[in-house]
Amino acid sequence: MYKSSENINRFTEEIENTFWDDLEKFNFEKIKREVANLKKEYFSFEDYNIFIKILKRLKADKRKNVNGLYLNFYKFLLNQKKEIERVRQMYNFDKYFGNYIYVAGTDEVGRGPLAGPIVAAAVILNLNYVEDKKLILGVKDSKKLTQKARYELSQTIKEKALSYSIAVINNKEIDKRGISWCNNEVLRKAVLGLKLPVELVLSDGYAVKNLPVRNEFVIKGDSKSVSIASASIIAKVYRDELMREYSKVYTEYNFQSNSGYGTKEHIGAIKKYGTCKIHRLSFLRNIV
């Protein structure tokens, strides 16, 4: 793996000076592994000349299976270019609102479930990226990602964020205050939990009340804003993990699968076993 800048530079030297110039000396499996490593680590189109060299070597090789790697890698680069352009647009969207240094995106998950808390996250990213390598590729609306992709992106976002914050309001408070108040409050708490002086808050769908800084709401923000999408991913992963832990205590309700939402199976379990300590009783008046 070529994670550090030192390793990236060394890998670049290897590409330019050894392996790809002597491709015929290596067997197919070795070449296949090297192409796979490129896909994992080497996606920046600032390295365009290196990619062209590799493609030419793969295409010129006399082995058909190596030529197949050329087509595979070429398609990968085209898709990667589209992804870089898509994510660039999401970064640029957040920069459009003004010359701010610290822009926070915030989003919540868990407004509608019958059980468990509502969770929000707020994220500040470095929007002034210099290289494509600095972009968080793959970021999008958390609902459009697989569980595995969400988890991996959540880890990457936390590592690259300038600051992030997670806020939680439990089911008891939801029953006491109502979901609308809790929805706003959990977003507000997430923003106020950031460790940097926020200048602008971008929120998904509607404004967050009682914030001390400028707030712009964005319709379908988790598809347009990199900061909102990042917050959406962190919040979703955090809540899903929490519900999996609850499922170990309250085994009857299959929380690890339904995350507390009102699936047919979940409602059936409530009718059979009654409620547990994390159910939102105010949501169950027509069920129990």
Curated annotation (Swiss-Prot):
InterPro entries: RNase_HII (IPR022898), RNase_HII/HIII (IPR001352), RNase_HII/HIII_dom (IPR024567), RNaseH-like_sf (IPR012337), RNaseH_sf (IPR036397). The lineage of its organism: Bacteria, Bacillati, Bacillota, Clostridia, Eubacteriales. PANTHER family: RIBONUCLEASE H2 SUBUNIT A, RIBONUCLEASE HII. Its cofactor is Mn(2+); Mg(2+). Belongs to the RNase HII family. Manganese or magnesium. Binds 1 divalent metal ion per monomer in the absence of substrate. May bind a second metal ion after substrate binding. This is Ribonuclease HII. It is found in: Cytoplasm. Its EC number is 3.1.26.4. It catalyses: Endonucleolytic cleavage to 5'-phosphomonoester. A divalent metal cation binds at residues 107-108, 204. GO terms for molecular function: manganese ion binding; RNA binding; RNA-DNA hybrid ribonuclease activity. Residues 101-288 form the RNase H type-2 domain. Gene3D superfamilies: Ribonuclease H-like superfamily/Ribonuclease H (3.30.420.10). One of its GO terms (cellular component) is ribonuclease H2 complex. Endonuclease that specifically degrades the RNA of RNA-DNA hybrids. Keywords: Cytoplasm, Endonuclease, Hydrolase, Manganese, Metal-binding, Nuclease. One of its GO terms (biological process) is mismatch repair.
